[in-house]
């Protein structure tokens, strides 16, 4: 394994950490409706738990309302129950075979709590990125010990991985700032 291989591997893993962080951010409810909010809601579909997107069409009715239309009329109650039990604090209302999910406005206190949650998630993502940097640096030390690369190559590799770490940490900070702005916008 060379410095370039290690760097490429670390970059891919760091990118996966960012993607996981983005997925976690999407679950944080803001005042506006978005279909991604219901992505992790699981529905009991004839005895097996499946994502809501597999049993219903999820769309936006307006800026504060999500519309959910189950493909089978029999599934309306199960989908409504899954949304209600989905720990998002949402209260769906059924109108015929369409479920409307209004987004309640967030209180100032709840907004502040959500920004703390986002910062906590960000710190977890940063720790994951830094752990990947540490693993890469240990890999470089091992390569030097095995005489596969020179100490100069090790230093260059560590510098490149540090630049990657800085880049991904900055991206996390940018995502946090955007999410906080979205949460605090009334």
Curated annotation (Swiss-Prot):
- What are the entry keywords? Cytoplasm, Protein biosynthesis
Provide the GO biological process annotations. Answer: cytoplasmic translational termination
Q: Identify the main location.
A: cytoplasm
Question: Where is this protein found?
Answer: Cytoplasm
Out of the domains of life, which is the source?
Answer: Bacteria
One GO molecular-function entry: ribosomal large subunit binding
Pfam family for this entry, one = RRF
List the GO terms this entry assigns under cellular component, sorted alphabetically: cytosol
Per the UniProt entry, the signal peptide is none
Q: What does this protein do?
A: Responsible for the release of ribosomes from messenger RNA at the termination of protein biosynthesis. May increase the efficiency of translation by recycling ribosomes from one round of translation to another.
Similarity annotation: Belongs to the RRF family.
Q: What is this protein called?
A: Ribosome-recycling factor
Gene responsible for this protein: frr
């Amino acid at each position: 394994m060379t410095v370039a291989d290690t760097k490429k591997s670390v970059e891919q893993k760091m990118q996966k950490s960012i993607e996981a962080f983005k997925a976690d951010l999407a679950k944080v409810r803001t005042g506006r409706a978005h279909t991604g909010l219901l992505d992790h809601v699981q529905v009991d579909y004839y005895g097996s738990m499946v994502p809501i997107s597999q049993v219903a069409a999820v769309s936006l009715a307006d800026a504060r309302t999500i519309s959910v239309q189950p493909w089978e009329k029999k599934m309306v109650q199960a989908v409504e129950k899954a949304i209600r039990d989905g720990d998002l604090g949402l209260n769906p209302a059924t109108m015929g075979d369409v479920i409307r999910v209004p987004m309640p406005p967030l209180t100032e206190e709840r907004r502040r709590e959500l920004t703390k949650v986002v910062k906590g998630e960000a710190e977890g993502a940063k720790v994951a990125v830094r752990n990947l940097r540490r693993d890469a640096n240990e890999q470089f030390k091992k390569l030097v010990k095995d005489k596969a690369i020179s100490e100069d190559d090790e230093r260059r590799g560590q510098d490149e991985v540090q630049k990657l770490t800085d880049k991904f940490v900055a991206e996390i900070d940018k995502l946090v700032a955007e999410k906080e702005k979205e949460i605090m916008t009334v």
